[in-house]
A protein has these predicted regions:
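Basic, polyanion-binding surface patches
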Residues: 1-146
Length: 146
């Protein structure tokens, strides 16, 4: 999405473009405050992970480290970068598309062979400063033809 920095893309975008690897760390309601700390617009030579006092662990298939606080880590390789129309002059806007090559899920969040989304309470970014937590889950059968 649009970069909060006025001089170009986010550091994360630049790192992915340069290294072709990244980790998607799923944020939960419990970790929302630490996740928010990583949004601090620091200088390029400063680490948002260090700023937020987050611990990392070695990833299994990619060089970038995974966050220990995240119960799900998706290790990815860059597939494609899609440039989008610029909203404000001088800013960058684009989407990174990755191929997931490995997933780590903490056992506590697996129930009957599936991710227990209700226990996980993942965050969803809605836009602006708005977020949501997934805590109301229901199933619906797909319609069939007769």
């Amino acid at each position: 999405g649009p970069s909060p920095k006025k001089e170009g893309p986010k550091d994360t975008f630049s790192n992915i473009k340069n290294n072709n690897e990244f980790v998607v760390n799923i944020s939960t309601y419990e970790s929302k405050d630490q996740m928010n700390e990583t949004c601090m617009p620091l200088e390029s030579d400063k680490s948002e992970i260090d700023f937020a006092s987050l611990e990392t662990k070695a990833s299994k298939l990619v060089k970038p480290k995974s966050l220990k606080i995240s119960p799900i880590n998706m290790e990815c390789i860059l597939h494609k970068i899609v440039d989008l129309p610029v909203v404000n002059k001088g800013e960058y806007n684009g989407i990174i598309i990755g191929k997931v090559i490995g997933i780590s899920i903490e056992d506590d969040y697996i129930k009957d062979g599936r991710v227990d989304v209700k226990k996980l309470k993942p965050l969803a970014r809605l836009g602006y400063m708005d977020y949501s937590v997934i805590d109301n889950i229901f199933e619906m059968n797909r319609p069939t033809t007769k």
